[in-house]
From Swiss-Prot:
Protein name per Swiss-Prot or TrEMBL: Aspartic protease 1
Gene: ASP1
Example of a GO biological process term: proteolysis
Cytoplasmic domain ranges by topology: 1-110
Protein species of origin: Toxoplasma gondii
Domain called Peptidase A1: residue spans: 275-616
Amino acid sequence: MSPSSRFRNLVSVDSSSQDFGKRSSLYASLLDSASVSSLPGICSTAEDRDVEDESWKDPSSSSHCAKTEGGACAFPRLNQVLSSLRDPMGVFSRAKRRRSLGKAVGLSTSVICVVALFGIVCLCLYGLVNFSFTSVETSPLDDPRNSPVMGELGNPQASTPSSARADTPARHDRQNQMFSPWSVQNEQFLGEDSDALPHAGPLFRSGVMVMPLRKMKSLRRIGWDKNTITVPDLQAHLVAALRMQEGLSKKDDGNLSGLSDGDDISIHDYMNSQYYTEIYVGSPGQKVRVVVDTGSSDLWVCSASCGILLNILHKTYNHGKSDTYHADGTPYHVQYASGPVGGFLSADDVALASLKTKNFLLAEAVDLKGLGTAFFFGKFDGILGMGFPSLATKGLKPFMQAAVEQNVVKNWVFVFYLASANGVDGELAIGGVDQERFIGDINFSPVVDFRYWMINTKGLKSDGDLIAPTTKMIIDSGTSLIVGPLDEVKRIATMMGAFSVPLMPEGMFFISCEKAKVLRDLQLEIEGQDYPIKIKDLLISASAAAGTPCLFGMMGLKALEGGRPTPQKNGFGIFPPSQLVASAKGPIGRTWILGDLFMRNVYTVFDYDNKQIGFARLKN
């Protein structure tokens, strides 16, 4: 074999695999052109080596050939050339693999992060939803004998005996008719109730259960709470209206017309507050916050079936977690000023503090879009109607009626005390009156319409002069302001310097906050007694900025003028008179509605047993 042939066989390592040779034409050309003469210092076996060439014996020679295990030798220079061809390809291949691996790792990391984030979100949602369902545990603090008034725990003799309380002379003849204090049997029922409210339980004064109340944005804004106006800058709009009213700047009149797109300002942002308390539904009890509303008679709560978002924002009722739930399924629908509420009926235990009714038929609300943002972002989860049975939806009854029928409470009597005290915004007394909250006698007036808590009065007065001749008044805890016939409210507003603002609903008025402070209080005469409507309560701040007028706390409605109701303008829209009061059944005639602005200045007693409403002066 010639040296050239042996060289080809030598350098063609892994000749059975010609992949690399096929990939590199430079490598093939090197093999084809290789010869002994052109590549000096090529090594060979000893027998074929030229004896005259002794350079291979010199280890220091640059062309020295090192023997391999198979008897072949490696040529350093050629190996360097071949390495220079192989290495770049290896580098490129490794870089590509690294990039692919990096992409795979990055994608895997992203997927893991997304899955982990989704799991965390689901866990949070699950926790929030389940946080809404608070079990009721027995608490010794709720035992009525633990009250400072009724004696120490374990010493029932320390409380005033029932017989002694029954013999206590009444402060008023009508008080004798309505108040039969709690009996020993009632006290034992309350003390043995295994579902008594923990920590937020009631305070018992003279045998009367007193529940705390909290304030929130009003639910019923007399048909205006869902309607909005579009004003680029509402504050500037109101300031300009006040200036124009006072004649300070006529050029600002241009700001009151030709308004374009801007922020939607809901009218209810300027309403005062409404009051709510807590009830427990089911066994174990699930806490729900409800507005105590004398203008309606149903009890409805937000159902757990109303959607994930409302389950997060509200405390909902899940009948699947109640051991005392009984299905009914009858469709439910009620109309409020802002829109309808829909759902279905269910039966379960309902507890207001320690007063628990069994198998009470209530409504689970699942369609609450009609209430708009007033409910969506509100602090309440339902409505506890305290109105007359005739106002209730067919098949339902007021909570107080069920409580009396089940002997949970002896008297169908409840009382509102809306002055702040003891760190709360008000109190709701059940079953009687709290002698610590008022002075003098309770002045009663008979109810004249058994659909609403409506009484006859002598009308509104100012300095002894009659300024509103309408005498019928509805006492409604579900209304924040004082609402009356549009013509009478306009006359009173003009007399007091209040003014209307373009684009605002008809019947809504504003007034200078500073100038109105010098006005005198109004009076409402009921059964020969005058009760105040304070000017400071009629001034509702619309903005903290200087120069912004206050909302006047009286609103006018055509629907309250009597006769045939007609639609009323509301900024850009019109709302029908049917959206006046929740569940309105038939016309109510020429009437005023006295809301929280009036009730906060008096101790208000609702006595269904004797069909009367009582008023007393606040103690403090």
